[in-house]
Amino acid sequence: MARLGTACPALALALALVAVALAGVRAQGAAFEEPDYYSQELWRRGRYYGHPEPEPEQELFSPSMHEDLRVEEQEQQEPHQQGHRTPKKAIKPKKAPKREKLVAETPPPGKNSNRKGRRSKNLEKAASDDHGVPVAHEDVRESCPPLGLETLKITDFQLHASTSKRYGLGAHRGRLNIQAGINENDFYDGAWCAGRNDLHQWIEVDARRLTKFTGVITQGRNSLWLSDWVTSYKVMVSNDSHTWVTVKNGSGDMIFEGNSEKEIPVLNELPVPMVARYIRINPQSWFDNGSICMRMEILGCPLPDPNNYYHRRNEMTTTDDLDFKHHNYKEMRQLMKVVNEMCPNITRIYNIGKSHQGLKLYAVEISDHPGEHEVGEPEFHYIAGAHGNEVLGRELLLLLLHFLCQEYSAQNARIVRLVEETRIHILPSLNPDGYEKAYEGGSELGGWSLGRWTHDGIDINNNFPDLNSLLWEAEDQQNAPRKVPNHYIAIPEWFLSENATVATETRAVIAWMEKIPFVLGGNLQGGELVVAYPYDMVRSLWKTQEHTPTPDDHVFRWLAYSYASTHRLMTDARRRVCHTEDFQKEEGTVNGASWHTVAGSLNDFSYLHTNCFELSIYVGCDKYPHESELPEEWENNRESLIVFMEQVHRGIKGIVRDLQGKGISNAVISVEGVNHDIRTASDGDYWRLLNPGEYVVTAKAEGFITSTKNCMVGYDMGATRCDFTLTKTNLARIREIMETFGKQPVSLPSRRLKLRGRKRRQRG
């Protein structure tokens, strides 16, 4: 009794200490319920790097697991006391394989489907409650989308690695299809590369929520000079980044076959989907003459987590009822027909020609009077798919078609005004041959270039005639008479010959742009997030990058900014660069030549050969995003696509007529201080894109007296009306009179010579 009496105070003290400890653990657990995710992340990282050895947390495991852990700790302590050698049995937890097997053994299909559903839910709940052991699911295989390494949905903070050679080869560069810069020894290299070549290296993705992992896609290092790739690897998963379970193949660890070269992606599906938060890739072999380097994408389905405030806050949804899927050629044509049937009064389907393999290049016109050019109404176009593997632009334009039709039918005032005041042309797929090749590869396995070129191997983006060189050579010859105008520069004869290396698709676009008096256009591309404006070609010889502005540089800057500033991500200073270039210093815009020089681009050709101001719009880091990404990409670009079309109504517009009120075609419109002219269309109407300000504008035409007036451009949307009435010159009137009476006018020089000859004969 005395012993019991003395033991009671000690027992009470121990119970009090346990209560305090449990309260501390509860307080610590409560931190996970805070809405500020980043506080949780900092706490987790401190624990991750501060405790390299796993420490069991009492509240995160079930009571049955406490006994297993105690048994395991005893087995681990005894060898250390006997010689510090751990037997192989102590490496694997005892209960983890049993639990894994238990969950994997789902019952066969039975009559009571509700019972099976309840058991599946209970198993997933057990997986979510057990933060230490991942769960394998052997249910019907679900096709899971990529987590988003390539699309940057997975942030740099979610990527970790055992070691890295340097910052430019860190874990944050281990993204599928990421591209290296010209100088590969900078911060923007083409893969994650381990600091050492041994079997202890790994790269890890933190999904930040329970995820059903189903597969891994890998690539080698993107480099012009080096050959580095991983030829085999293991896959491990975890719920706490300390206790890891290796994907098994029977009783042993499964070795996945990796890459045999550095660019073609290789997909490996897990034999059984694994539910966990973390996934780790552990290279086992690599190219003999290279290093451990890889790029990757993870396939997985995030499990619903209503208690996670961070993910609910960042989920992207759309209210537009559109067809969010990838459309092959047949499906694209069918969607166009559906839109045309929905809105027959404002749409028209036509084709501008055929591809190398005979596929028609379909376009859709949207106008209140489809099929005709209305005097005073500007023409606008969108083009996508010049590179067949840059699929996002194609799908965005198909979504735009459907959206404009729906909103016009719903009497959306903004869309109705746009359709009634603009003639819109949309060409979703300029290179359908290349697209079909990329479509066969799929959104993740096509690599960076499959389907980029036409069927005959031509890059349409730089297949147009180089008119820049003709213009600049003429400008450099100041003493010689001007042979090349500053606009409507003629296409060289060699380019028009049948033997010229010109794609069928390129010739079709040129004929299309010569036929329709486009004022503004945008060609949608992929692989970056920026708007590029001309010139695209540098003026200085032997330079690959140099800012080369057009005479309308201020207008082009505004047009580019109008798209970028209304895009959800382009001007976001917090966003990560896609590959190597940081375009935030110019608010998501760039002069094409200062980025990289391109001779014969569509932008430069359009500016120098037609009236059209053309820009390249790079709509996403991922050229070919998964279908699940399309709603978010539509939300990112929808407002920008509409705002850019509305810019066709900025500047001045008018009609150039003669005294009888007839429109004068091919009249030249010049703006003082801008060394670039435009011309009137067949009805005498014109549109000149200008920023707000006061301008001195001149209209001139052959056989007419030049007319000049001041035109004011305001800040409000809508072009300022600036009409001209030209009077014929005396010589033109004489010629007109003589032609009316069937006689040719007598030229004055020849008449004077005849009079002189008569006088000489009379004197002689």
From Swiss-Prot:
InterPro entries: CarboxyPept-like_regulatory, FA58C, Galactose-bd-like_sf, Peptidase_M14, Peptidase_M14_domain. Residues 325-648 form the Peptidase M14 domain. Residues 71-136 are annotated as: Disordered. May be involved in cell-cell interactions. Residues 1-27 form the signal peptide. It comes from the Eukaryota. Residues 142-301 form the F5/8 type C domain. Keywords: Disulfide bond, Glycoprotein, Secreted, Signal. Disulfide bonds join C144-C301. This is Inactive carboxypeptidase-like protein X2. It is found in: Secreted. GO terms for cellular component: extracellular region. Belongs to the peptidase M14 family. PANTHER family: INACTIVE CARBOXYPEPTIDASE-LIKE PROTEIN X2, PROTEASE M14 CARBOXYPEPTIDASE. Glycans are attached at N239, N249, N289, N345, N499. The lineage of its organism: Eukaryota, Metazoa, Chordata, Craniata, Vertebrata. Residues 82-98 have a biased composition (Basic residues). Residues 121-136 have a biased composition (Basic and acidic residues).
